[in-house]
UniProtKB/Swiss-Prot annotation:
Species annotation: Vibrio vulnificus (strain YJ016)
HAMAP family: PSRP
Function: Bifunctional serine/threonine kinase and phosphorylase involved in the regulation of the phosphoenolpyruvate synthase (PEPS) by catalyzing its phosphorylation/dephosphorylation.
EC number: 2.7.11.33, 2.7.4.28
NCBIfam families, per database record: PRK05339.1
Sequence positions that bind ADP: G157, V158, S159, R160, S161, G162, K163, T164
Lineage: Bacteria, Pseudomonadati, Pseudomonadota, Gammaproteobacteria, Vibrionales
MF-aspect GO terms: ADP binding; ATP binding; phosphotransferase activity, phosphate group as acceptor; protein serine/threonine kinase activity
UniProt keyword terms in alphabetical order: Kinase, Nucleotide-binding, Serine/threonine-protein kinase, Transferase
Descriptive protein name: Putative phosphoenolpyruvate synthase regulatory protein
One Pfam short name: Kinase-PPPase
Family according to the record: Belongs to the pyruvate, phosphate/water dikinase regulatory protein family. PSRP subfamily.
Catalytic activity: [pyruvate, water dikinase] + ADP = [pyruvate, water dikinase]-phosphate + AMP + H(+); [pyruvate, water dikinase]-phosphate + phosphate + H(+) = [pyruvate, water dikinase] + diphosphate
InterPro entries assigned to the protein according to its UniProt record, in alphabetical order: Kinase-pyrophosphorylase, PSRP
């Protein structure tokens, strides 16, 4: 029986990028409070690569005395069969879903290697993603306020409230062009909406955070500074949240949310539609 203090190796295996396996694996493992030693093996599309992977699985089993967990997605039946025979608990992350869809719509699936996000198969999607990322990077942390008419959304908040990681996630995963602007200490006195934002009010969205958590984050960056003090964090947050309320800017508290959750809630509250899947 697995205990909370006992660690276990976890492998994410795919004949593609393994991103899907990692994502679903993280969701599942998040419900089990044990220490996971995670390893990812992408592009396992040949007997040679599978043999190398199985060696790692066997070493894990021999070293730890318990079977590792393997979340996998493999198209070739022979590779899948060999993996299932290894000393591990193996979970095909797509099989049950694909089978259910097949049964419901009465259509045979046609799986292919590395189907997702291939540049050759969907050039427009690829370049749309790159354009969104480039725009977002160029407008990160208040670097530039030019071209706001091209923005899908403008994130506002104090420094270290989660704006940059959320912006990049929304660009990479949703294909959205995101501007993020930080309110720093110099802005707090007489805080008001920038003139550049007035005609883009419908794009404004605020991120806030509990002062205790903000202090903790800032302490990791600049320990012992006024910037990281509880009083400073409380002062900045109180003024920025007052601005959000005064200007009717919707906002959420990011304290206990992951980047994925923040991004999804922003879409939900703004009605924005993701451009890419």
């Amino acid at each position: 029986m697995q205990t909370e203090k006992q660690s276990r190796d976890v492998f994410y295996v795919s004949d593609g990028t393994a991103i899907t396996c990692e994502t679903l694996g993280h969701v599942v493992l998040g419900q089990f409070p044990f220490v996971a030693n995670e390893k990812t093996f992408p592009f396992v599309e040949s007997e040679e690569k599978l043999t190398e992977l199985i060696k790692h699985i066997e070493i894990s089993f021999q070293t730890n005395g318990i079977k590792p967990l393997v979340f996998f997605s493999l198209v070739l039946p022979d590779l899948k069969a060999r993996l299932m025979e290894s000393p591990a608990y193996c979970y095909d992350v797509l099989e049950s879903i694909v089978q259910r869809v097949k049964d419901d719509i009465q259509m045979e699936p046609t799986p292919k290697l590395q189907r997702s996000r291939s540049v050759g198969k969907d050039t427009d999607t690829y370049f749309d993603r790159i354009a969104a990322i480039e725009y977002t990077l160029a407008h990160d942390d208040g670097i530039s306020l030019k071209g706001l008419e091209l923005a899908d959304i403008i994130l506002l908040g104090v420094s270290r409230s989660g704006k940059t990681p959320t912006s990049l996630y929304m660009a990479m995963q949703f294909g959205l062009r995101v501007v993020n602007y930080p309110y720093i200490d110099d802005d707090i006195k007489g805080l008001k909406l920038l003139p550049e934002f007035e005609i883009h009010r419908h794009k404004l969205f605020g991120l806030t955070i509990d002062p205790e958590r903000l202090t903790e984050i800032r302490e990791n960056r600049l320990a012992g500074s006024d910037y990281a003090s509880t009083e400073q964090c409380q002062h900045e947050l109180a003024n920025v949240e007052a601005l959000f309320r005064r200007e009717a800017i919707p906002y959420i508290n990011t304290t206990s949310l992951s980047v994925e959750e923040i991004s999804t809630r922003v879409l939900e509250k703004t009605g924005l539609k993701r451009r890419l899947f």
